[in-house]
């Protein structure tokens, strides 16, 4: 409807299917670190209005500077009414890619991300995906967890790669 200024900001955890759907519509997509604060920072830096996180926080700077579920829900309902479509029809252009998230608790004595075995498992997964998927390995900002996220077109392959990386982390943190 011409109201979107610029593009959309998501986090590192945003599904590749969202990025592809927006790109297919000619809408730029940028990724920030995880957290509303980082989404807002990137929105301001780029001069854009709309962003969000997988947690469901949707930020529409033209309405508010924080995530507001009521405002986001009302905007979706308005679009549905204007188009005369149900939610499923409105979302037909987006197909989420298979995504696996494994959380691994660890003690803070050493950094598992610095391990050669973990780096080797990451490199192997990236080679298997060959540009058709991605791996994200990050520490939680709120608890002693490592998050292994894998996504790509082949669900079995995505799960296998995530589990291999998780196993390498468990081996060095045991």
Language model segments and positions:
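Phosphate-binding and adjacent anionic-ligand microenvironments
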Residues: 2-174
């Amino acid at each position: 409807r011409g109201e979107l200024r610029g593009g959309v900001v998501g986090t590192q955890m945003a599904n590749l299917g969202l990025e592809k759907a927006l790109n297919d519509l000619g809408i730029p997509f940028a990724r920030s670190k995880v957290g509303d604060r980082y989404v807002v920072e990137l929105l301001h830096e780029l001069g854009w209005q709309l962003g969000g996180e997988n947690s469901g926080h949707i930020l529409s700077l033209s309405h508010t500077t924080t995530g507001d579920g009521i405002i986001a829900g009302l905007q979706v309902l308005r679009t549905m009414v204007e188009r005369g479509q149900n939610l499923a029809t409105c979302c037909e252009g987006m197909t989420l890619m298979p995504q696996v998230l494994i959380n691994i608790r660890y003690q803070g004595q050493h950094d598992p991300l610095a391990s050669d075995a973990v780096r080797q498992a990451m490199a192997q997964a990236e080679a298997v995906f060959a540009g058709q998927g991605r791996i994200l390995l990050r520490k939680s900002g709120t608890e002693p967890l490592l998050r292994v996220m894998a996504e790509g077109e082949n669900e079995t392959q995505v799960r296998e790669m995530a589990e291999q990386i998780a196993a390498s982390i468990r081996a060095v943190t045991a």
